[in-house]
Amino acid sequence: MSSNKIIIANWKQNGSLRTLQSLTSQIIKALKLKSISHSVVLLPPYVYLPILAKKVTSAKTLRNLSIGVQNVSAFSDGAYTGEVSFEMCKDFR
């Protein structure tokens, strides 16, 4: 029985933009150099998502690398301070 493993890098509240850009570049480079069959998903803090998503999508040859969000609110809208809805996250596509 074969299983496709998923490696998820949830960076939580760690790292500056510069640090996470560098780390993302290093991951892209490593995936290009090594034959890794596992899927890799990067989950940066929301404030860096647009910048790092652009970096990930520019690495078009890497079909096993993707980017996502760390948390989605249970509510679709409303006065929920700090929450991010699924609809808002879809705008990052």
Describe the residue ranges of each PLM region:
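Conserved N-terminal beta1-alpha1 strand-loop-helix module at the mouth
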Residues: M1-V84
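Non-catalytic positions within long, well-ordered alpha-helices that form the structural scaffold/packing
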Residues: G82, K90-R93
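Surface-exposed charge patches
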Residues: E87
